[in-house]
């Protein structure tokens, strides 16, 4: 189909949608589009998976459980399922992971950016398998949340504001290649030499560090202005 051709160069992963909500001991997975084993799946209705307390990480996975070659088409049988094995096989993708204490509720609303990686009782999206043009990607929801928090910062530099708008205006997730370029430029403090190749939780931690730096004015326009004023005073 035209849609399969449009996304033929994308790797396996979530391409759009699949937003998560937790209520009544159920994880609700919204409509979306997923590529798995080089086939595009359109999820047109909400799916639900019941969850229970777990003292170790449990992964919510999208899984192809059966593939049948018929005379004129291929039929797939798929499922969303919880698995305490975090490793993925070729027919699996991770949607999220979590640890849940007995008596606690699972949260999909976050207090702040760092909260996405809170150890217990929170849906963790940092290691979800997302797909973008150009390669694998960090969750669109994670990068959008990062962008919104950057735009709340008065000290944000123009380049951070521009990148935040780029993330928010992108209809799809942004590849790790682009994200790593931004991380490298920020980490090198203007001396762009290193090449970063981080994914998942490590990429999330880098963005968390950058956001904290922006919030504290570690590399802000305000600091640049202060340095210039001090130089003017010295010259006088």
Question: Model segments located where?
Answer:
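N-terminal "first-domain core" detector
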Residues: 1-45
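Beta-strand-rich solenoidal segments
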Residues: 35-236
């Amino acid at each position: 189909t035209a849609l399969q051709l449009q996304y033929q160069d994308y790797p396996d992963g979530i391409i759009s949608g699949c937003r998560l909500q937790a209520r009544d001991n159920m994880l609700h997975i919204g409509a979306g589009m997923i590529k798995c084993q080089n086939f595009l799946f359109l999820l047109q209705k909400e799916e639900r998976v019941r969850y229970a307390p777990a003292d170790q990480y449990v992964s919510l996975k999208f899984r192809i459980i059966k593939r049948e070659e018929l005379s004129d088409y291929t039929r797939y049988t798929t499922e969303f399922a919880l698995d305490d094995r975090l490793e993925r096989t070729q027919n699996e993708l991770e949607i999220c992971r979590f640890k849940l204490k007995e008596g606690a509720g699972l949260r999909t609303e976050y207090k702040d950016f760092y909260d996405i990686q809170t150890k217990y009782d929170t849906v963790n999206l940092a290691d979800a398998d997302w797909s973008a043009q150009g390669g694998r990607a960090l969750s669109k929801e994670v990068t959008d949340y990062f962008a919104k928090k950057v735009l709340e910062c008065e000290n944000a530099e123009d380049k951070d504001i521009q990148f935040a708008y780029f993330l928010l205006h992108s209809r799809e997730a942004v590849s790790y290649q682009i994200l790593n370029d931004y991380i490298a430029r920020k980490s090198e403090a203007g001396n762009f030499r290193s090449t970063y190749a981080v994914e998942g939780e490590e990429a999330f931690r880098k963005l968390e560090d950058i956001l904290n730096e922006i919030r504290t004015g570690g590399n802000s326009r305000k600091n640049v202005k202060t340095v210039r004023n001090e130089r003017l005073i010295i010259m006088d």
